[in-house]
Amino acid sequence: MTGSSPPLSCQQVDNTLHIPALSCRGGFDFSLLFEELILGILPLGIVLIIAPFRLYHLFWRQAKVVASWLLWAKITAWLALGIVQLVLAVYWARPAATRTQASIAANAIITVGFFILCLLSCAEHLRSTTPSFLLNIYLLFTLLFDIAKTRTLWLRSSGQTDETIAILTSVTVGIKFLLLILEAVEKRHILRKGQSGYPPEATAGIFNRSFFLWLNPLFRSGFSKILDVEDLFDLDKHLSSRRLYSTLETLWDKVPKKNPNTLLFISLKAFKWPLLSAVPPRACLAALNFCQPLLLHRSLAFATEPVNNHTNSIGYGLIGAYILVYIGMGVTMGQYQHMTYRTITMVRGGVVSMIYNKASRLGIKDADPAASLTLMSADIERIVQGWQTIHDIWGNAAEIALAIYLLERELGVACVVPVGVALVALIGCLITLSFVVARQAVWLEAIERRISSTASMLSSMKGIKMLGLKSAIMKSLHGLRLEELEISKKFRRLLVWNMALGWTTRIFAPIFALGAFYGIMHSRGKDSAFDMSTAYTSLSLFALLADPLLSLVMALMTFVGSIGSFSRIQEFLEKDDHVDCRLKPLHASYESFEPKAMVLVDDSDATETASDRSIHRGKSVYHDALTVKNATFAWNVEKEPVLKGLTISIARGSFTMIVGPSGCGKSTLLKAILGEVPCVNGEIRLSSDSIAFCDQIPWHMNATIRESIVAMSSFDKEWYASVVHACGLVQDFEQLPRGDETVIGSKGIALSGGQSQRIALARAVYARKDIVILDDAFSGLDAATEDYVFHSLVGIHGLLRKINSTIIVASSSAKRLPYADQIVVLDKMGYASEQGSLKALNAAGGYVSSFGLGSPEWKSEIDKPSVTDLAQPKILRPNRTEAIKEDPRRQSGDLSIYLYYIRSIGWLPTRLVLTDMTGIWVKWWAISNEEDPNGRTGYYLGIYAMLGAVGMLSLIIGCWEMVINMVPKSGESFHRKLLATVLNAPMSFFAATDSGSILNRFSQDLQLIDMELPVAAINTFATLILCLAQMILMGIASRYAAISFPLVILAVYSIQKVYLRTSRQLRFLDLEAKAPLYSHFSDCLNGLVTLRAFGWQPALEDKNFQLLDYSQRPFYLLYAIQRWLTLTLDMVVAAIAVILIVLVVTLRGTISAGDVGVALLNVILFSQSIKLLVTFWTNLETHIGSIVRIRSFTETVSSENLPTEKDDVPPNWPWGGDIEFKSVSAEYRPSEPVLGDVSLTIKSGEKVGICGRTGSGKTSLIMSLFRMVELSSGSIHIDGVDITKIPRQEIRSRINGVSQSPLLIKGSIRRNMDPNGSYAEKAIIEAIKSVGLYTKIQEKGGLDTDISEVFLSQGQQQLFCLARAILRPGKVLVLDEATSNVDAKTDEIMQRVIREKFCTHTILAVAHKLETILDYDKVVVLDAGRVVESGDPCTLLSTEGSYFSRLYASSMALAEEQ
C-alpha cells in the first residue's frame, strides 16, 4: 500500500503495548513492555500503596503468633526472591540484553518492592491470626503473570544474556510458587497462649475460604454422627450478638425517627463494610458471566478455522480461558453469597437483640408476646429472604445493561425488541411492587392474631381440657388460620404475576428478537446473515438477559417485602418505653414525708410496735422504705384513675398488709409501687430499688425447681436450704422423682397450685432483697402449710425478718392482719380509707374492725433445717439418664417429603422440556437457512413461537394451581393436624415440652410452609428439569461429551450424599435452636413485671444474647455449607465446560459448528440453571424441614385418646351425679404415681369436700375425673357409666368445672361465656348478673366487648368463671380450689351462687379454707395420693385424732388463740 509504514519488528513491538503480529511468536503473546508495566509494576504498585496502611494497622496490634520455623522460612524465601530479582535487574542493565525502555526501571522497582513485602510478611505473620490476604492475592496473580512473561522470554531469547534472564525469571517463578505455599499455611497450631478458641473460619487463609475447606471437619462430623449444636463451630467475635446489638443500637439512638425506613437505613450503615465486601466478587461474577457469550462466539469461529499452529495456539488459549472463567465464576459466586449471608447473620443478630431489648422496656399494656414473637419469626425471616438477593438488584441491572449492549453488537437494531420485552416485564414488576408491602403487612397481621391466640391456648391447656373446650378452640383457631390463608391469596397472586413476568423475557425475547432480526436482514437482502454464530451467540445473550431479569424481579419483590418487615419492626421499636414514675434514692436513706391529712387513722402506736420488733431484727426502722404522697394512679391516663389521692408511708423493715374488697385496686397499688402503673398526680418514693415480687398468679420459666428458685442470683447452699425449708418444700422434693431437679414445665404446668406458689415465694425470699412485695401469695396454700410458711418467712424469727426486709403483702384474706405492723385499707373507689396498726384501726371502727380480730400469737422460732440433709441426693436428686432418641432421618433424609411436592407440581415440568427444545429448534432453523436462505422462515418461526407460548401458558397455569390452590390447602391441612395433635396431647406432654417449642411449629414452621416453601418448590423442580434437559442436549450435540456424564452423575451423587447428611441435620438444628430463644422471649414478656421488679433485665438480656448466639450457629453454618455446595456444583459445570472445549479443540473438523453451538450454549444455560437450581434447592431443603418437623410432631406426640374410649353415652348423661372410684391408681408419667388405690363412693346430689396438705393429690383426684391423668389401674363410674370407655372430650363437656386459675380466652365477653355459641343472650346476661358483674361489663360496652378491656380483678375473674359454669349442662360440679384466691366478700358471693344455682348438683370441692366445707355432706382427706379418711365433717371433727380434725385445728388455731 502506497505511503504505508513497514511492519514493526518483534523487538519494536515488544517496546509497545500492542499484541504481536502473527509473524512474531505466532501472534499469541503479549508484548514485553505490557508484561513489565501492566503485569509487573501495576500489581506491585497497588500492593505497595496499600502496604503502609496495613503495616500501620498491624503495628498497634499485639503479637498473636509465635516466631516458628514458618516465619524464618518466609523471610528466607522473600530474601532469596529479592536477591534473585536484584541479579535479574543487573542482567537487564547489561548492554547485550534485549530490553525495552522500561526494563531496567521496572526490575529495579520490583527488587525494592520485594524487600518491602518481606517486612510486611513478618508483620502479617506475627500480628495476624490469618494468612495475609494481600500477599496471597499478589503472589497468586503475579505468579500467573510471571509464567506468561517467562514464556515470552524463552520464545524471544536470542543470546546468552537473554537466556540467562529467562533462567533467572524461571527461578523467580519457582520461588514465588514456594512463597505462595508458605504464605498460605495457616497459623492455628502456632498461636500464642490466650489466642486459642478461634473458629476455623477465623484462622482460614484465602484458598481455604475461597473453596470452603474450613467446613470439611463439619462435614466429617455430620457424615459420621448425629450432630448437636455443641458440635458446631463457635461464632467469631464479629458475629457476637452483643457486639452487633451495640453497633446497631448506638446508631439507632443517634438518628431521628422521621422516616419509616430509618431502621433499614441504619442497618445498611451499621453493616456497610460487611455488605460492601460482597461487591467486588459480585462485580467479578457479572464480568465473568459475560465472558461466556464471547467465548462461545470465539469457539464457534474457531470450529470452522483451518488446522495450523496459530489456530492450535488459539485452541489451547480457549481451554485456559474456559478454565479461568468457569472456576472464577464458581469462586466469585461462592464468596459473594457467603459474604452476603454473613451480613444477613449480622443483621439478624442485631435486629433480634433490639426487638428483645425493646420488649423488655415496654409497658405492661404494650407487652404482647405473640406480636413480638411474630416480629422475631415471620418478619425476621422476610428480612433474611430479602437480603439474600440484595446485591442481585444492582448486579442484575448491570448484567442486563451489558446483555443489551452485546445484543446490539450482534443483532443491531433488532435488539430493541428483546429490550422492549424486558422493559415491559420490568415495568409490570415495578407496578406490582407497590402492592407488595401493604398486602404483606395485612397477611403478617393475620399471622400475628393467630399466633397470639395460639400462645394464649398453650398457656391455658389445663383449663381448656377441664372445661371440654377442645372443639371450640379448634374451631376458633382454625378459623383464624383459614382467614389468614384467604388474606394471603392477595399476596400470592402478586407472586404468580411476578413469576410470569420474570419468565416472559426468557421465553418471548428470543422469539421476537430473532424474528425481527430475520425480517430486517431480509429487507436488506441479507437472508444468509442468520447463521450458526449469530443464532447461538444471540441465544446465549438472551439467556444472560432473561436470567438476570428473572432474578432481578424476584430480588426486588423479596427486598421490598423485607422493607415492609423493617417498617413493622421499626414501628414496634418506636413504641413508648415503660415510664417508671417512682423517685429512687441517690443515697442509702432519707427522711420520710410528713403524713397528709385524709381519711386515715393517726397511729402513733404503729411506730412503737415496729420499734419494739426491730429489737429482733437488729436494724433501725425510723427511715421509710416507701412513701406515697397524694398519688393518683391510672392504667390509662386518659381514663378514670384506679387509685386516687393515696398518701402512705411504710417503715423500713416493717410488715405492711394491703386489704380491701375485690376489685378495689390492691394489685394495682403493688404494681404502682413497682413502677408499672403511671402516676397521674403526686409522687412515690423508694429508699431502695432492691425489690423482690411474687405475683398473684405465679410466674415461672421452664427450668428445674432449683433454677427457678435461684434464678439470676448466685447459688448459696446454706441459704438455699434455709429458704427451701422455710417455704415447706422439703417434703415436696422428697415426693418428686427428681427432687429439686424436676423440670417444672412452661408456666409451672408440672406443679400443683400450692407448689407453684411456694416456689415463687422461695424465689422472692432467696433473692435477699430490701423490699419484698407479695400479691396474695399465701392464698393458694392449705391452712397448715400457709401457717408454717407464713411464720417461717414473716414471723418474728422468719427469714425475711432476719434479713430486715420490708414486707408488703396484698391479701384477699384478713386473718394475717394481727401480725402486720401497718394495715392499709382500700375502698371500692380506689381511696385509702384506713391506715394504721390493727389496734388503732380496731379502736377507730371501720372495715378492719368488722373482722373482730385480736392480738397475734407469734410462733416460737422455727427449727433450723439440716443443710447437710438437704444437700443429699435423696432430696436433690439428679436427672435420671434418659436415652436420646436419635432420628436417623436427620442424616439420611426422607424422600417421601420431596415426592409429596413432586406430586403437587403435576405436569408443570412438561413446559420446561418444551422451553428447552427451542435451542434445538433454532439450530435446525439456522442450518435450514444456511442451505436455503429464507426458504421456510415462517414455518420455523411459527413453531418457535408456539413452543414458547405453550410453555408460558403451562407455567402460569401450573404456578397458579400450586400457589393459589394447592399451597393454601396444604397449609390448612398442616395447621389442622398440628392443632389437633396439640389439643389431643396428654397433660404430661405439656409438662415435659417447652411451650416455645410448640409455638415455634405454629409460627416459624407454618410461616415457612406458607411463604417460602411454595416458591422454592416451584423453582427447584422447574430448574431441575431444565438442567436435565440441558445435559441431554449437550450429550446429543457431542457424543464424546456424553461419555463424561456418568462421571458427572457419580460426582454429583457423591457430593449430595456428603452434603445432605450434614445439611439435613443443620436444617433441624436451625429450627430447633430457635425454640429456646422464642421460649425465653415469651417467658420474659409474660413475666415482665416480676423481672423488672427483681431488676433482672440485664441478666436476662445476657441470656438472650447467649440463646441468640446459640441459634446463630446452625443458622450461619447452614448457609455456609450451602455455599460449599454451590461452589462444588460450579466446579462440576466447569469440568463439563472444559471437557467440551477440549473435545472441540482436539476433534476440530469432525464436529459441526451447529453441534458445537448447541453444546456450548447449553453449557452456558446449564451454568445459569445450576446456579438457580442450587439457590432454589437449598431454600427448598431448608424450608422442607418444617414439613418434616410437623409430620414428625404429629406422628410422635401420642394422643391422650385411647382406642378403647369409643362407647356412646345418652344425651342427658350424667342425669343424677352418682360417682364411684374403684381402686383407682393414676400417674402423669410412667413410674410417677400421683394416686394410689383410691376407692370412693359419692351419691347423687352430695356435696363432697376434698382436703389435704399441699401436694397430697387433691387436684390429681379431680383431674382423674376429667381423665387428665392416666389411670394405671381401677375405674371411675358416673351414673353407672365407666368413664374409661367413653371419649374424654365427651366427659369434659358433660362435667362442670371451675379451676383455681381463671380461664379467660382471647376475645369477647360473649365468647368467653359461651365458647360454642349455644346460649341465648338473655341466659348469658342472667348468669353474669347472678355473680354481680353485669353492671361493670355493661359500663365497658356489653357482651361484645373484648374481655381484656374490662380489667377484671383476680376475684372478679373467678366470679366470671362461676357465671360461665351456670350456663353449662350436667349434674356434676367440680371446684378445684376455686375460692382460694378471693376475699371474704367474693367468697361469700361464690358460696351463695353455688348453693342457689347448683343445689341439685353433685359437688366435689377441693378446699384449703376448711370452714367453707363444714356444711358439706362428706369430706375426703388425701395424703400422698391416697384416701386416708372420709366421712361426715361434723363426725370427723368430733373424732379425736382424725386427719380432718387435725387439719381443721391447724387452720383454725389462730382463731382459737384469738
Curated annotation (Swiss-Prot):
The keyword Signal does not apply. Residues 283-561, 933-1182 form the ABC transmembrane type-1 domain. One of its GO terms (cellular component) is plasma membrane. It is found in: Cell membrane. Keywords: ATP-binding, Cell membrane, Glycoprotein, Membrane, Nucleotide-binding, Repeat, Transmembrane, Transmembrane helix, Transport. Residues 626-853, 1219-1449 form the ABC transporter domain. It comes from the Eukaryota. ATP binds at residues 660-667, 1252-1259. Glycans are attached at residues 208, 309, 630, 702, 804, 879, 1316. GO terms for molecular function: ABC-type transporter activity; ATP binding; ATP hydrolysis activity; ATPase-coupled transmembrane transporter activity. Belongs to the ABC transporter superfamily. ABCC family. Conjugate transporter (TC 3.A.1.208) subfamily. This is ABC multidrug transporter B. The lineage of its organism: Eukaryota, Fungi, Dikarya, Ascomycota, Pezizomycotina. The gene is abcB.
